[in-house]
Curated annotation (Swiss-Prot):
The lineage of its organism: Archaea, Thermoproteota, Thermoprotei, Thermoproteales, Thermoproteaceae. It comes from Pyrobaculum neutrophilum (strain DSM 2338 / JCM 9278 / NBRC 100436 / V24Sta) (Thermoproteus neutrophilus). Transmembrane segments: none annotated. Keywords: GTP-binding, Hydrolase, Metal-binding, Nucleotide-binding, One-carbon metabolism, Zinc. The keyword Cell division does not apply. This is GTP cyclohydrolase 1. HAMAP family: FolE (MF_00223). One of its GO terms (molecular function) is zinc ion binding. GO terms for biological process: one-carbon metabolic process; tetrahydrobiopterin biosynthetic process; tetrahydrofolate biosynthetic process. Its EC number is 3.5.4.16. The gene is folE. Pathway: Cofactor biosynthesis; 7,8-dihydroneopterin triphosphate biosynthesis; 7,8-dihydroneopterin triphosphate from GTP: step 1/1. Disulfide bonds: none annotated.
Length: 187
């Protein structure tokens, strides 16, 4: 991990110190391996910071008409709130007008999941995702809608489990109505 390369305390030791600070007995059998598991889980949740974006494969359009929008609704993804490092459960809907070829469906989904795998502020993430999709999909236009359930306000602070945040971004001339539903685990 990056922290180890910088010669800083091993991440597991930092987690162990935090657990002790919170009053946990870190020698307890159920907790003794928690620092290692926590660091591994956090690594998975932030893999987008270290891994390159997935390659996008394109297929020829094979027709002469102007392509209409392609819509992919309710892509499930998980991110972290950059302020509290608590999970954000996301449902992302994307529409794009293909440029020179159509990207593979699974590649679009993988790209969204990769983009979400990092600490984010949802408002900024939505704008960045629209730019990223325009570039990587070689699209003529893109629309994005992100519905997020933020654990930082679900389990702490206002403790409201019924809300969700919806953010939208659009690039180019695209006329679609996206329907992004609350993430599946939060319905």
């Amino acid at each position: 991990m990056v922290l180890e390369k910088r010669g800083v305390v091993k991440p597991e030791e930092g987690v162990r110190a935090l657990l002790e600070h919170l009053g946990e007995d870190v020698t307890r059998p159920g907790v003794v391996d928690t620092p290692k598991r926590f660091v591994k889980a956090l690594g998975e949740l932030t893999r987008g910071l270290r891994e390159p974006p997935p390659e996008v494969v394109f297929f020829p359009l094979e027709y002469d008409a102007e392509p209409g929008p392609v819509v992919i609704e309710n892509i499930s993804a998980v991110s972290l709130c950059e302020h509290h490092l608590l999970p954000i459960l996301l449902s992302v809907s994307v529409a794009y007008i293909p440029g020179d070829g159509v990207p593979g469906l699974s590649k679009v989904i993988r790209l969204v999941k990769w983009a979400a795998a990092r600490p984010i502020m949802q408002e900024r993430f939505t704008e960045w995702l629209a730019d990223l999709l325009m570039e990587k999909l070689r699209a003529r236009a893109v629309a994005v809608e992100v519905c997020g359930v933020h654990m930082c306000s679900f389990i702490r602070g206002v403790r409201d489990e019924h809300h969700n945040m919806v953010t939208r971004a659009k690039r180019g001339d695209i006329d679609v109505k996206l329907r992004c539903r609350r993430p599946p685990l939060c319905r």
